[in-house]
Design a protein with these regions (language model features):
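Conserved N-terminal catalytic/coupling substructures associated with nucleotide/phosphate chemistry
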Residues: 1-138
């Protein structure tokens, strides 16, 4: 991303395809967010930006954050294609931007979970199966 593209990105509000994280969430929460993006319309996670206020905080160790993100994806997500991870310098700070495509082989699950997560507005929700699917044992 160019600085101009990054600025346009952080000027947007969180929603179905955009999530801001001031710092690294728990591995479970990040896995749910990533798989929810894959199961819905794809999306972008910007690390180093406070959600709600959009205050820029930066990421102290972008390479360390990338390693953590990759490990969580490898250990907790059942993905067929890895998201794109970029480092962005802006305003004298470093940010990590993770771009998740819409998945082609849905549903994507978090390891140990039996139901997929989807993105609804700016939150992740467990997808509900239709009554017919539940009765069939799907």
């Amino acid at each position: 991303l160019t600085p101009e593209e990054f600025e346009q990105l952080i000027d947007q509000r969180e929603g179905e395809t955009l999530d801001f994280k001031r710092e690294m969430p728990s591995s479970s929460d990040l896995a749910k967010l990533i798989t929810a993006f894959y199961n819905t319309h794809g999306g972008t996670i910007v690390f180093g930006v406070e959600n709600g206020t959009r205050r820029l905080a930066g990421v102290p160790s972008p390479q360390g954050a990338e390693t953590g993100i990759v490990n969580i994806i490898r250990d907790r997500c059942s993905l067929d294609v890895m998201p794109t991870i970029e480092f962005v310098s802006y305003g004298g700070m470093q940010f990590v931007v993770v771009t998740c495509p819409q998945g082609a082989r849905k549903p994507y699950l978090v390891s140990g979970e039996t139901r997929p997560y989807i993105r609804v507005g700016s939150s992740n929700r467990e997808a509900r199966l239709s009554r017919g699917a539940e009765e069939r044992g799907s």
